[in-house]
Amino acid sequence: MFEPLLYFDERANLDYQSYLLKKPTYIKYLYKEFSKEEYQIDIIKIEFPFNEDQVNGFENDGTSSIYSYDNCSEIMTECFENSTTPFVFLSAGMKFNNFLNSLELAKSSKINLLGFLCGRSIWQDSIDIFCQSNHDNFMDWLNLKGRQRVKKLKNVLTDT
């Protein structure tokens, strides 16, 4: 499994808004490049071609959105429609509902998505319980809410 790294760096000659607008192009390039046979990559672990806080209808921190749901569907199709190497989406610490929405969007875009790799998006809401409550409450959260979240994500991939 191979994960190309893409992130905004303030040292680059690019402001954050411009980076966000170019991110789909970067993701498309990374996926296409590392799908080449010469790299012999079996699975690509890649992020969504848009940031969660930039999509209308997704939870954000008061930032203004630059993409509609339909824009994101088109972007997803453009980036991955001719996929040749299996790929999974990583959560990159997205809020759970945003990751779920992004995964649903990917599934509805009819791209050849293999699956997902998700960590923080599933359990990050349990940190306060871990820090401010007790072990039993934390384990209860993981066993109930955490498992429910994994099931929801899996259902997106298995439901047609």
Features from the language model and the residues they span:
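Glycine-rich phosphate-binding active-site loops on the catalytic face of alpha/beta enzymes
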Residues: F48-F50, I111-D128, N143
